[in-house]
Design a protein with these regions (language model features):
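Contiguous beta-strand segments within globular domains
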Residues: 1-4, 110-136
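Extracellular ligand-binding interfaces
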Residues: 1-63, 85-87
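Aromatic sugar-binding surface patches on proteins
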Residues: 49-56, 161-172
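Extracellular beta-strand elements of beta-rich domains used
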Residues: 57, 70, 89-96, 586
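Noncatalytic modules at the cell exterior or secretory-pathway interfaces
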Residues: 62-72
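Extracellular carbohydrate recognition
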Residues: 64, 78-97, 667
Length: 681
């Protein structure tokens, strides 16, 4: 169940060296390696250059029957500024080994001999829970907190329970609020020291900022890369627009203007949320302004923008040479301009006193871009961008939400009644997409793709679960005295009820389930294509139903899934974290503390209170597994696409393999976690 390779790397000048190791077998169906989506049978590892590396690949759940090949691959992807002309690898040994205790990859059960807790710590008023396997409890079930001097400061009794045929023991010390550094002890298990402090989340924010900085495009990043991608550009009306800037998308070199704009929004909000920590707030401001510059620069000024590029190579930064990328996508659709107008309006509201000139400019272009968006929307409605755009799955409901939020922000900025009118008009349309009375399964508060209520909104990779509530909370803030504010708050409250309905089915770790589904949704072939890229409808139709039936039966053809229904693209970070953001926003608006507590528990899941007892933030806490990061390399603060499921199951799966999509670092996931930490601050 382990492959071990001894490898020497000699790559001239290379700062990041990540070869790939592959297994290929001759097995049918689900036992085939690689699988049909090329998501299994691969792993990468960042090597130290000009040194020997013992490369270990644990594969306890990978089919090892009829293995035909072991492959070594290395992507030649252009030359970064420090790269030389040659790469060499020397293989000294290839071995297959058996481990005494294979690493856990699948399932809800706690890992025996491990404490599952929030390794970054807890804030005094937040829920404070940890879990262990029942066999790790002492006979009396007692657990303790000890301070830095070894003194016992708290004693509690664990509560045992069974969930989905798995045993758990929960250690709850939420009522302990004294600030300090502590260790949790139960039976023979002792945690690493962790803080209970008001600023317990700040270190995680610093770590995420480190990752975001290392994803910068068009900027030298020490130890990572030099100035990059100065020869990639968009063409429009005889103009060339350089597209180097903002942040790279993930483990590759792709760039998404919408993602950079949304990340900038999160950074702007975080800079305000963490204003009591001056150094942290200023660093957030610095990174936000980097993203804002790119958002402003992608405008051609006529409603068309440079929007995205898929790129998996370095370029030589010389315009006119053979490696130029002149195929940056351009578009003038409503969605991209709505997102960017929000970013610009947020900056215009936040910048006065810091940069008055830039504040004025942001306000000017925010109004222009909103006008472009509405003109396009009124003419064409929902338009499909390239399938590789992060907004490809955007529904009519999501467009309504973006319009409401943009108009609400612009009203706050300008006090022009036209924006208030647009925001209130589209708020009615947005609320018409919500399930506002008990559905056949008894659940309320979720949103459909449009007013017809035929198809629920679902995500399985990129996600914006929180956006309807974000729009309504912004509108409530902008127009608190409007008579319709009662209805807006009711809609937000209904979404809170939806979150509570999901939480009622949550595991002891507290992960919010992905959502509710109807069996007959699979008959909508057109929407299937929007939601499930690189997935064949006829092939996956029976798998859709199989996935539902591994969830919880709510009756009348309705099901609840812990994880999304998905096929090729799998990873739960964005779904879970945008649900958490929705819970936190609802809590802020309605002062409902239980919803904030649910949001807090999602952040704690990423900090180690999950079935793998592992931090899902690279370099933070214990057992944070190496991410898939071919170009940026291992970077503290990286958050991956997320925990997946195996086949049609509804159990968490976190393989030891380092490959896409689930293990790939992703700006979306990092920004979503930062957003949650900002909202619960």
């Amino acid at each position: 169940d382990r492959v071990r390779v001894r490898l020497y790397t000699a790559c001239q000048g290379s700062r990041i060296v990540e070869p790939t190791l592959c297994l290929v077998n001759d097995e049918p169906g689900d036992r085939a390696v690689p699988d049909k989506f090329n998501r299994t049978g691969f792993t990468t590892c960042e090597m130290k250059n000009f040194a020997w590396t013992d490369w270990l690949w644990d594969i306890p759940e990978l089919s090892r029957a009829n293995v035909q090949e072991i492959e070594f691959r290395f992507r030649i992807s252009g030359k970064e500024v420090s790269d030389g002309d040659t790469v060499n690898f020397y293989i000294a040994e290839i071995a297959v080994e058996r481990t005494e205790e294979p690493e856990k990859e699948t399932g809800w059960a706690p890992r025996p001999g491990r404490l599952h807790y929030a390794q970054a710590g807890y804030r005094p008023g937040d829920p404070k829970l940890a879990l262990v396997a029942p066999e790790d409890l002492p006979e009396d079930g007692a657990f303790t907190l000890t301070d830095e001097n070894g003194n016992v400061v708290y004693t509690g009794e664990a509560k045992s329970m069974t969930w989905k045929e798995n045993g758990f023991a929960t250690l709850d010390f939420s009522d302990f609020t004294a600030q300090g550094r502590y260790r949790l002890q139960v039976g023979l298990l002792t945690s690493k020291p962790f803080p209970i402090a008001e600023d317990a989340n700040h270190e995680t924010v610093w770590q995420i900022l480190n990752f975001i900085y290392c994803e910068r495009c068009g900027c030298p990043v020490p130890g990572k890369h030099g100035l990059c991608h100065m020869d990639i550009y968009a063409r429009h009306n005889g103009l060339l627009l350089p597209f180097g800037g903002g942040w790279h998308d993930a483990g590759d070199m792709s760039q998404q203007a919408a993602q950079t704009a949304e990340t900038t929004q999160v950074l702007l909000q975080a800079a305000l949320s963490f204003s009591n920590d001056t150094m942290l707030s200023e660093r957030l401001w610095e990174e936000a302004l980097w993203g804002l510059e790119f958002t402003l620069r992608t405008r051609f000024g006529d409603g068309v923008r440079a929007s995205s590029l898929g790129l998996i190579r370095w370029t030589d930064n010389k315009i006119g040479s053979a490696d130029d990328a002149d195929n940056v996508r351009t578009q003038g659709q409503a969605m991209i301009n709505l997102i960017d107008s929000q970013t610009e309006a947020m900056a215009a509201l936040a910048l006065p006193g810091r940069d008055d000139g830039l504040a004025w400019k942001c306000g000017q272009v925010a109004e222009e871009d909103f006008a472009f968006a509405m003109e396009r929307w009124e003419k064409y409605g929902v338009e499909l961008p390239s399938k590789w755009e992060h907004t490809y799955n955007a529904s009519r409901c999501l467009h309504y939400a973006e319009i409401v939020r943009a108009a609400a922000l612009l009203y706050q900025l300008t006090k022009k009644e036209g924006y208030a009118k647009t925001a209130t008009e589209y708020a009615d349309k947005l609320m018409a997409c919500q399930q506002d009375e008990p559905s056949p399964c008894g659940v309320v508060g979720f949103f459909y793709r449009d007013e017809s209520h035929k198809r629920l909104i679902h995500y399985n990779h990129q996600a914006r679960e929180h956006l309807p509530v974000l729009a309504l909370t912004e509108l409530i803030k902008a127009l608190p005295g409007n008579p319709a504010c009662v209805e807006w708050k009711r809609s937000v409250k209904l979404f809170g009820e939806y979150i509570r309905s999901l939480a009622a089915y949550a595991s002891p770790y507290g992960m919010l389930p992905a959502g509710v589904y109807q069996e007959n949704e699979i008959e909508d072939r057109e929407t299937f294509a929007l939601e499930h890229l690189q997935s064949d409808y006829e092939t996956e139709k029976p798998n859709y139903l199989a996935e539902l039936r591994n969830g919880d039966d709510l009756g009348n053809g309705w099901w609840l899934r812990q994880f999304p229904v998905w096929f090729s693209f799998r990873g739960n970070s964005a779904i879970q974290l945008t649900l958490a953001a929705g819970a936190a926003l609802t809590s802020q608006t309605l002062k409902e503390k239980d919803l904030k507590a649910l949001a807090v528990r999602q952040a704690q899941w990423f900090g180690g209170c999950n079935p793998f007892a592992a931090s899902l933030i690279y370099g933070a806490g214990q057992d944070s597994s190496e991410p898939y990061a071919i170009f940026p390399g291992k970077t503290v603060g990286a958050v991956a696409v997320g925990i997946q499921t195996k086949g049609n199951s509804d159990e968490p799966n976190w393989p030891n393999s380092v490959c896409a999509t689930y293990k790939e670092v992703w700006m979306t996931a990092a920004a979503d976690l930062l957003q949650v930490l900002s909202l619960i601050e």
